[in-house]
């Protein structure tokens, strides 16, 4: 079966479904790297991708946003030593799907909504508070516009409304 659109899983109701020790067959999340670039570098600005609404972000959307931001930052700054990119949200929540058949005679083969709990098909990160930070990038002043464009592109992969906050990093904090 093909992957359902992200709008099917954007909103949530009820508690998170996270206990993987009780759930057989949970697929691994596509996103595996959460810190990229030179994390120990000396940077001037911190860019934050902030969620403006509550919802869920599927693991493949997080991975797509990460790959796009990383590729743009690496290609346009010249090296992965000129920035630090950190994904803060982890896809803990297990997403289920009650598969339905859609062909002639399917009503004789399936049970409809009887026993409709569903099988695990993926994972999602939950954004439960407004203003939660999804990703952070740290850059020097000369790469600020490049990082802003990379985050605008990455925000298009996230199924929620987002904004980009730019915070200058104080110099005394860097020295410590």
From Swiss-Prot:
Molecular function terms, GO-annotated: structural constituent of ribosome
InterPro entries membership: Ribosomal_uL16, Ribosomal_uL16_arc, Ribosomal_uL16_CS_euk_arc, Ribosomal_uL16_dom, Ribosomal_uL16_euk_arch, Ribosomal_uL16_sf
Pfam families, A to Z: Ribosomal_L16
Gene Ontology biological process terms, A to Z: translation
UniProt entry keywords in alphabetical sequence: Ribonucleoprotein, Ribosomal protein
Gene3D superfamilies reported in the protein's UniProt record: Ribosomal protein L10e/L16 (3.90.1170.10)
PROSITE patterns the record matches: RIBOSOMAL_L10E
Keyword Ribonucleoprotein attached: yes
Domain of life, source organism: Archaea
GO terms under cellular component: ribonucleoprotein complex; ribosome
Record-stated family: Belongs to the universal ribosomal protein uL16 family.
The protein's name: Large ribosomal subunit protein uL16
Organism: Sulfurisphaera tokodaii (strain DSM 16993 / JCM 10545 / NBRC 100140 / 7) (Sulfolobus tokodaii)
